[in-house]
Amino acid sequence: MKRSKTLRAADAKVDREKLYAPLEAVRLAKETSATKFDSTVEVAFRLGVDPRKADQMVRGTVNLPHGTGKTARVLVFATGDRAAAAEAAGADIVGDDELINEIAKGNRLNEFDAVVATPDLMGKVGRLGRVLGPRGLMPNPKTGTVTMDVAKAVTEIKGGKIEFRVDKHSNLHFIIGKVSFSDEKLVENYAAALDEIIRLKPSAAKGRYIKKAALSTTMGPGIQLDSNRTRNLLVEEDPAAV
């Protein structure tokens, strides 16, 4: 099939044994992008942690300087003035008891990408854990999604703030933009994500912390990154200029 040939041709351009510099990897990812639409660019990390142990859990948020290329849809659980503030800040869905009941039934789950709640409603929102938890959407004070300042939370999420959490296989996944982004913007987003992961390294984690990093586009081949190159990513030697 024509599609298969395209994918095979893209895959053949990637050296599976090589660890690519971030700027080189971004350029290769664009070159091997095999879709007709503006593909998402994602980075996956394998960490040297045991997420089954509470003191090795890696979880947090990062403000990508150039956003992800997609405006997140935000649901806010709030009442009164807080609800009005959330709506004014651009929240897509705002409500309290009735909305909580709706979500508990499994309704509207495809209508939002992030959830914010005021502390006074968390007693009720807490029962949504079985619905929101598996989707990584449960509000949490540590990530700034349980707050009285819902307007600020909505603005930050809409502006490119993303939440991350290591999965049971010790992997982390980040969307760092679109193929249409400039090379510099993609690398700067990657650097922001990487810096935050490094900052959150658990003291209990032993041995090599970042075991593997790979960059890819939608349906594109994985490109192994040299995770030792963590600083000055834009001024390091550029293979294209050699």
UniProtKB/Swiss-Prot annotation:
For this record, an example GO cellular component is:
large ribosomal subunit
Keyword check for Repressor, yes or no: yes
Q: Which GO terms describe its biological process?
A: regulation of translation; translation
Signal peptide start-end: none
Keywords linked to the UniProt accession: Repressor, Ribonucleoprotein, Ribosomal protein, RNA-binding, rRNA-binding, Translation regulation, tRNA-binding
Q: Could you tell me which PROSITE patterns the record lists for this protein?
A: RIBOSOMAL_L1
- Assembly, per entry: Part of the 50S ribosomal subunit.
PANTHER family tied to this protein: 54S RIBOSOMAL PROTEIN L1, MITOCHONDRIAL, LARGE RIBOSOMAL SUBUNIT PROTEIN UL1M
Which NCBIfam families does its entry note?
rplA_bact (TIGR01169)
Listed name of the protein:
Large ribosomal subunit protein uL1
- What is the scientific name of the source organism? Kitasatospora aureofaciens (Streptomyces aureofaciens)
State which gene encodes it.
rplA
